């Protein structure tokens, strides 16, 4: 297993980065990379067969910026982009940074209703989309974009829309007017995954991306050159990994449609030395070839103690825990040279550069070391606000601190531990129970693929605990019984944390970031006890 990491301590790394001079924009970072590595491979779009050097990428971005400027796209103009992973997507992003305009990434899996919501709430003046998504335009009811404001990638019925390739051909040899660039200019309206209510548009500046890209590249503490982008570019992870490649002068490899089944096959075939690996990949059936890869490091997110160690054995690579969210970018990270000793600790690491963190009580005051509270973050480059939503912005910030909504604790050495969501709790007989804590225990039982904990109203205890169980392929309730599950919980949890109700499911509704959408589970039936096994009364309800 690779372990040749630099040993710079977190405080020293933070001082070095926070006193460094960063570029004025993401485009300027690209220009610097192209100047240093003009002929080095920049990206490869695996399924399209498209490869570019950094010099070629810069030239294409300049052409796109000239084409956009001719349409009237300039500082502050909102441009929605809806596509799978193809090179026009990052070209558009970088060109918009060149013009100080704003990209609104649109999830390619969205329904017409969701597309309309994004276009309406973002006030998008232009839309760039792949031809396959044109039918969404016919379904719009409350949003109307002039055909001349729609740019179509690929072939398809245009109906007055502009064609991407035609615009690029016409702009060859031209340059957009010079635009003063500021790191404080908004570059993205990045929609959250919407775990509660409608998605909110986070106003993310160029500085947000520069702080995230530069610091996360330093977290790796080793020289990486081949970055697998196993995430769609409309998600922030895909954009962040491109910045990692840019900062390091490496190459980013994009599958058109990322997926858990192809993930490790791609990584091995392409000899990638870095990836950000979601737990859905780990949950794929193990292959004898899993460890046959060139990975030096993988970023992971909220792996349980046992799965973290098993992941490292299975894929023969260290998994570096990272805590972040759309609003804050990076919050904490595990120093690479500490991964081995901290594996199995369930810690997400220490505070990231450009960030301060506080564990706060309900009144916003810091709690003692080791006590549980809400993780709050402040620092350079956080979201400016939720676009068009002053109420949500006011609720998210308190005394200058962004409230993550995550319950956490920090130990005496500064290592942080995420315990659950502030609203993802069950209050049973006066005890606050973290749903995530119970879910982690459930997932360690052989035969359980995934689990979700929700509260059930109860006249006597206030709330009872219900466990939704998704069994692994080939396992059925006759072998993984409620009794076996409850016994397992009883051996790993205090009695008041053991679920009372158990219901089996074939699958879970998931958010964009692969989190269970518990609001849908809660809304499925008026009485959540129906269809569940009652462990206390030993009956099916």
Over which residues does each language-model region extend?
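ANL superfamily adenylate-forming
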Residues: 7-8, 134-183
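Conserved pre-ATP/AMP-binding loop-to-beta segment of ANL
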Residues: 38-41, 169-191, 198, 220-226, ...
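Conserved AMP-binding/adenylate-forming core of the ANL superfamily
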Residues: 42-86, 90-94, 111-116, 165-166, ...
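Conserved structural elements of the adenylate-forming
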Residues: 58-66, 183, 188, 202-223, ...
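AMP-binding/adenylate-forming catalytic core of the ANL superfamily
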Residues: 110-116, 127-129, 267, 275, ...
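AMP-binding/adenylate-forming catalytic domain of the ANL superfamily
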Residues: 153, 493-515, 535-541
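Conserved AMP-binding/adenylation subdomain of ANL enzymes
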Residues: 210-226, 234-273, 284-285
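Gly/Ser/Thr-rich phosphate-binding loop
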Residues: 247, 269-276, 282-342, 356, ...
């Amino acid at each position: 297993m690779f372990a040749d990491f630099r040993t710079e301590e977190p405080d020293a790394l933070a001082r070095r980065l926070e006193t460094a001079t960063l570029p004025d924009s993401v485009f300027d970072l690209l220009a610097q990379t192209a100047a240093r590595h003009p002929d080095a491979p920049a990206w490869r779009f695996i399924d399209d067969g498209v490869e570019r050097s950094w010099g070629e990428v810069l030239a294409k971005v300049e052409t796109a910026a000239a084409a956009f400027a001719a349409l009237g796209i300039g500082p502050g103009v909102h441009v929605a982009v809806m596509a799978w992973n193809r090179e026009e997507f990052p070209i558009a992003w970088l060109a918009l940074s060149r013009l100080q305009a704003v990209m609104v990434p649109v999830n390619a899996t969205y329904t017409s209703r969701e597309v309309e919501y994004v276009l309406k709430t973002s006030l998008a003046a232009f839309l760039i989309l792949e031809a396959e998504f044109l039918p969404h335009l016919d379904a719009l009811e409350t949003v109307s974009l002039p055909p001349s404001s729609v740019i179509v990638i690929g072939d398809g019925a245009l109906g007055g829309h502009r064609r991407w390739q035609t615009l690029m051909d016409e702009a060859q040899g031209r340059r957009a007017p010079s635009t003063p660039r500021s790191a404080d200019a908004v570059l993205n309206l990045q929609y959250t995954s919407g775990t509660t209510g409608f998605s909110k548009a986070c106003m993310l500046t160029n500085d947000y991306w520069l702080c995230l890209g530069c610091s996360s590249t330093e977290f790796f503490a080793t020289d990486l050159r081949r970055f697998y982008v196993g995430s769609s570019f409309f998600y922030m992870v895909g954009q962040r990994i491109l910045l990692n490649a840019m900062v390091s002068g490496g190459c980013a490899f994009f599958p058109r449609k990322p997926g858990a089944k192809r993930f490790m096959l791609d990584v091995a075939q392409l000899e990638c030395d870095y990836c950000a690996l979601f737990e859905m990949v780990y949950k794929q059936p193990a292959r004898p070839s899993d460890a046959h890869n060139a990975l030096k490091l993988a970023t992971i997110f909220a792996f349980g103690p046992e799965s973290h160690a098993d992941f490292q054995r299975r894929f023969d690579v260290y998994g570096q825990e990272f805590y972040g969210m759309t609003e804050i970018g990076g919050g904490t990270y595990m120093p690479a040279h500490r991964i081995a000793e901290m594996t199995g600790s369930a810690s997400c690491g220490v505070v990231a550069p450009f960030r301060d963190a506080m564990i706060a009580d309900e009144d916003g005051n810091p709690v003692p070391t080791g006590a549980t509270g809400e993780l709050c973050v402040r620092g350079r480059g956080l979201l400016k606000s939720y676009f068009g939503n002053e109420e949500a912005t006011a609720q998210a910030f308190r005394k200058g601190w962004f409230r993550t909504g995550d319950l956490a604790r920090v130990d005496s050495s500064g290592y942080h531990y995420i315990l659950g969501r502030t609203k993802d709790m069950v209050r049973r007989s006066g005890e606050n129970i973290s749903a995530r804590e119970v879910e982690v225990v459930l997932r360690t039982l052989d035969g359980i693929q995934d689990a979700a904990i929700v509260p059930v109203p109860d006249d006597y205890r206030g709330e009872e605990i219900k466990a939704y169980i998704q069994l692994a392929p080939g396992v059925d309730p006759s072998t993984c019984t409620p009794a076996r599950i409850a016994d397992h919980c009883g051996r790993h949890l205090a009695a008041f944390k053991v679920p009372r109700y158990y219901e089996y499911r074939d699958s879970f509704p998931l958010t964009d970031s692969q989190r269970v959408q518990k609001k849908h589970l809660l809304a499925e039936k008026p009485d959540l006890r129906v269809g569940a096994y009652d462990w206390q009364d030993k009956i099916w309800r």
